[in-house]
A protein has these predicted regions:
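Alpha-helical protein-protein interaction elements
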Residues: 113, 156, 233, 240-241
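C-terminal "capping" alpha-helix adjacent to the active site of nucleotide-linked donor transferases
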Residues: 220-237
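Generic signal for short, ordered secondary-structure residues
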Residues: 169-171, 224, 245
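A short, well-ordered alpha-helix in the C-terminal region of glycosyltransferases
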Residues: 230, 237-251
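Nucleotide-sugar donor-binding catalytic core of glycosyltransferases
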Residues: 1-217, 251-272
Length: 273
């Protein structure tokens, strides 16, 4: 039986962390051996861990290099979300996808044509493209579309995860602007899980393994989203993109797929040892 050391749960006052996603991945790791896994925030020193521990490092939206403590000799593999843009020389450090936060209940069972919202956005306000999106949304107030959007100040102060999942489940087009610093944010994989058509930053690190075959539509200027009207005028195109989005999610983000990927990475390390 695998051992999990979870330093995330209860750490954040808003209660949002990736524990459920990581635990679901670990359930799908089958190497024929038992392993120790540790969940940690990127800038927090690890607790005492046994040799070969597999560490999930999160919350480093600045894409920084791992801190020395996360590269200690007892770390077998370091799975790093927000992978450093310049790469990492330590072969134990692997790029890892953002998944979904605990209690996110969104799903892709509703066909695009039956969804009640043409487009939606709900998230924290920042000046990394979201200010332009805010302006565009305000101009679209009377556009005749069914929509729901809102901005709030500070991270983690918006909708509860279950309500947020419900919002994305009934959304056709999910607006996924950059996070505070990074072009990556959890909204992207969460909306993909719901089969939304994704409008995303044009500088996503699509060279990383988990973006292989990514069907999101890249946006350069968040103040000019004429693509929204083009998509809404072509329901078949939207459904086709939705289908490809679900396939990508199931192949690259779903815990079963990521668990299988991680199983192979662990086996490779064992063979090299």
């Amino acid at each position: 039986m695998h051992t999990i050391i979870n330093t995330l749960r209860g750490r954040f006052v808003h209660g949002k962390d990736e524990s459920e996603y990581y635990e679901s991945i670990i359930k799908n790791v089958h190497t024929g051996m038992d392993h120790t896994f540790c969940f940690s925030v990127c800038n927090t020193e690890l607790p005492e861990i046994p040799p070969g521990t597999i560490v999930f490092s999160t919350s480093d939206e600045h894409h920084r290099q791992p801190i020395p403590n996360h590269l200690q000799e007892n770390v077998g593999i370091l799975l790093k979300t927000f992978f450093p843009k310049e790469g990492v020389t330590d072969h134990r450090v692997l790029p890892f996808p953002l998944g979904y936060f605990t209690d996110f209940g969104g799903h892709a069972l509703t066909p695009i044509a039956e969804r009640g919202l043409d487009y939606s956005f709900y998230g924290a306000h920042n000046d990394n493209g979201r200010d332009k999106l805010h302006g565009w949304l305000r101009k679209r107030k009377g556009d005749g579309c069914k929509k729901e959007w809102g901005f709030y100040e500070g991270w983690g102060k918006g909708k509860g995860m279950w309500d947020y999942g419900s919002l994305l489940t009934k959304t056709k087009i999910a607006l996924c602007p950059p996070g505070y610093v990074s072009p990556e944010c959890a909204r992207l994989p969460e909306a993909a899980r719901c089969g939304c058509v994704l409008l995303v930053p044009n500088d996503l690190p699509t060279h990383l393994w988990y973006f292989q075959g990514f069907p999101g539509i890249k946006i350069e200027d968040w103040s000019n989203l004429k693509i929204v009207d083009e998509l809404l005028a072509d329901p078949k195109r939207m459904q086709d993109i939705s289908d490809e989005t679900v396939k990508w999610y199931n192949r690259c983000i779903d815990p079963k797929a990521v668990g299988a990927w991680l199983t192979e990475r662990i086996k490779e390390r064992i063979q090299k040892a």
